[in-house]
Amino acid sequence: MASLCFQSPSKPISYFQPKSNPSPPLFAKVSVFRCRASVQTLVAVEPEPVFVSVKTFAPATVANLGPGFDFLGCAVDGLGDHVTLRVDPSVRAGEVSISEITGTTTKLSTNPLRNCAGIAAIATMKMLGIRSVGLSLDLHKGLPLGSGLGSSAASAAAAAVAVNEIFGRKLGSDQLVLAGLESEAKVSGYHADNIAPAIMGGFVLIRNYEPLDLKPLRFPSDKDLFFVLVSPDFEAPTKKMRAALPTEIPMVHHVWNSSQAAALVAAVLEGDAVMLGKALSSDKIVEPTRAPLIPGMEAVKKAALEAGAFGCTISGAGPTAVAVIDSEEKGQVIGEKMVEAFWKVGHLKSVASVKKLDNVGARLVNSVSR
């Protein structure tokens, strides 16, 4: 369960195809991935719904994990989004209607073609070949937008799994990730380091996109691993943070980051939280360009390490900072120091929590049979 570490004082100072870039910079997604994102029907016979309604949950995620930019991510326990999906005769067959959005934000569009959950739901329905049933969807946001915790991926994952469940679980996790990528391509780019762990749980390595090749990395269950998540009151839009990425990198930095990403994978498989933290904290390519855009981030990382964290970096595109430790009690102390640094140096109020790894991923919470 999550533990609130410390809260700083109040009053501080689908089917949308992104346009391809004829000359993509080093860190841009290759346009061929984007133009081939549209999903295809995978089920020969249209399945009938086995439930009248379902409720699903998908967890928050930490993408990049330092040197694993766009190809490593993990799910964290206790934070995420819920989707309630119903068979609705008033909705046109083969379509989805978003009835309600509640939670941390209500400013999201209820147009399913402009909503992460809606796009993923439509993509999943297309994969299943659903043409004779209409669905209505309620989205409860447990994650704020632009937090660096995979908010869009959580919505997409919960929606994709909800559609799959209501029609009898005909699709596998890799196929659901593809459906979720339809949504991610619209919001933040065609990369799976949030949506894959949101659906599959645990750590996930994205080895390839054409074809999609996902490698679950299992952290040993008998080893302790905790994430200290500190989210400041500051929005870091993914598109803005991606625009800050360098277009060229020195070969020595490429070699360094590659070795640290390999060390991080080894640390996960061995259950070595210390090495995991060191590798996570070692990025020389992405973090140095993004940290200056988040007030106080460099001081927050320093405070985390001085307080005993094994490592600290930016979660996803930020602004959330993530530190790694092997004890919940130590994590609470580290979180307090990180919050203080955000306040003193960045003049930002923030909230810290200590979370375990979520090894389950998106799942069914409850259902009503026909």
Swiss-Prot record:
Keywords: Amino-acid biosynthesis, ATP-binding, Chloroplast, Kinase, Nucleotide-binding, Plant defense, Plastid, Threonine biosynthesis, Transferase, Transit peptide. Belongs to the GHMP kinase family. Homoserine kinase subfamily. SUPFAM superfamilies: GHMP Kinase, C-terminal domain (SSF55060), Ribosomal protein S5 domain 2-like (SSF54211). GO terms for cellular component: chloroplast; chloroplast stroma. HAMAP family: Homoser_kinase (MF_00384). It comes from Arabidopsis thaliana. The keyword Transferase applies. GO terms for biological process: defense response; methionine biosynthetic process; photoperiodism, flowering; response to bacterium; response to fungus; threonine biosynthetic process. Residues 1-34 form a transit peptide. Its main location: plastid. Signal peptide: none annotated. It catalyses: L-homoserine + ATP = O-phospho-L-homoserine + ADP + H(+). This is Homoserine kinase. GO terms for molecular function: ATP binding; homoserine kinase activity.
